[in-house]
Amino acid sequence: TVKTKDRSLSAQYEHTIVVTDNGCEILTLRKDDTIPAIISHNE
């Protein structure tokens, strides 16, 4: 956790993502995440 210029608290997190020919897969989703684990490319 860090403080911003205006002294607000801020946090960062990252995901591990596998990029494939067909799209990508997020490997580090939590149970409460609302984004899809697999994102496909539309061709």
UniProtKB/Swiss-Prot annotation:
UniProt KW keywords: Aminopeptidase, Hydrolase, Metal-binding, Protease
Subunit details: Monomer.
Enzyme Commission numbers on file: 3.4.11.18
Swiss-Prot/TrEMBL catalytic activity: Release of N-terminal amino acids, preferentially methionine, from peptides and arylamides
UniProt cofactor(s): Co(2+); Zn(2+); Mn(2+); Fe(2+)
SUPFAM superfamilies: Creatinase/aminopeptidase (SSF55920)
Known role: Removes the N-terminal methionine from nascent proteins. The N-terminal methionine is often cleaved when the second residue in the primary sequence is small and uncharged (Met-Ala-, Cys, Gly, Pro, Ser, Thr, or Val). Requires deformylation of the N(alpha)-formylated initiator methionine before it can be hydrolyzed.
Stated name of the protein: Methionine aminopeptidase
Family to which this protein belongs: Belongs to the peptidase M24A family. Methionine aminopeptidase type 1 subfamily.
Cofactor remark: Binds 2 divalent metal cations per subunit. Has a high-affinity and a low affinity metal-binding site. The true nature of the physiological cofactor is under debate. The enzyme is active with cobalt, zinc, manganese or divalent iron ions. Most likely, methionine aminopeptidases function as mononuclear Fe(2+)-metalloproteases under physiological conditions, and the catalytically relevant metal-binding site has been assigned to the histidine-containing high-affinity site.
Top-level taxon: Bacteria
BP-aspect Gene Ontology terms: proteolysis
Disulfide bond sites: none
GO molecular function, one term: initiator methionyl aminopeptidase activity
